[in-house]
């Protein structure tokens, strides 16, 4: 059975293996053991209540409960940009016009922005390619909404998610090549690694301070503004079906889109509810997959179960209850895994 649980210190080697499979561009999952160990420690201290809000971050892993294999990772930053500035570009417009010459040009322009300062962030989503099946990707991504719904007061009103931009298997980023490299004088992979290992001071020091007309970039770079890496397209679709939208903010490195949503408008958060759980044999039928989570802050767990999402009393097997660290009579959080498709 696949289970979402909080990260533990013993997971560092598994996270290193996952990091080696990302193919680059996933800034918050660098293949650096010291950085990953520090990330785990920060998550543990967050759960223990030892950090200020500006440093808090939760990390979860997807584990096969039978073998102990860690198949994926996901995380939530509680409030970005309160310690180090959180930069992105806002894609806006500058108009240059002359009535006398009968010239009017509306030019797409990139403005350096810190507009998302203080927002909660969904980040570090990665599922081992060998485990991309049977709803694991949905479970990994959406489990975070169950945690946010259960502990709503720990998060801010806006949630953002940076999507990985277009970068090839050799680490080539058209957007970086045309823009970032001119200011940073280093390859994309180097800048990405420095940022991922916490060495972010160079961003504020070297970033262009003035608006940038996108027409001055290569056509290849212009074409990838707001576009996602092919492997990230499913993750973007998942978030958009939950209510997230692209509001013309992009990553400063690879030009990937930043999606955002008011936390209380996220479908899985808004529609999740608490039901009593009982042990038994679940009813057979053509039921949809649902997310089921406990309400235990320190021992949070999420699993998938096929059941009626409108039930008032959820029947789970002994194995499912054990995976959730629940007992009969406890209340669990339940929501349909995927939104019901509307028909005309």
Swiss-Prot record:
Pfam families named among the record's database cross-references: AstA
Keywords annotated in UniProt: Acyltransferase, Arginine metabolism, Transferase
Which amino acids does the record list as binding succinyl-CoA? Answer: 125
Q: Does the keyword Acyltransferase apply?
A: yes
Question: Care to name a GO molecular-function term for this sequence?
Answer: arginine N-succinyltransferase activity
State the reactions this protein catalyses: succinyl-CoA + L-arginine = N(2)-succinyl-L-arginine + CoA + H(+)
What is the top EC class of this enzyme, as a single word? Answer: transferase
Pathway(s) this gene product operates in, as recorded in its UniProt entry? Amino-acid degradation; L-arginine degradation via AST pathway; L-glutamate and succinate from L-arginine: step 1/5
Q: Which residues form the active site?
A: 229
The protein's job, in short, is: Catalyzes the transfer of succinyl-CoA to arginine to produce N(2)-succinylarginine.
This chain's protein is named Arginine N-succinyltransferase
Species annotation: Shigella boydii serotype 4 (strain Sb227)
Q: Which gene encodes it?
A: astA
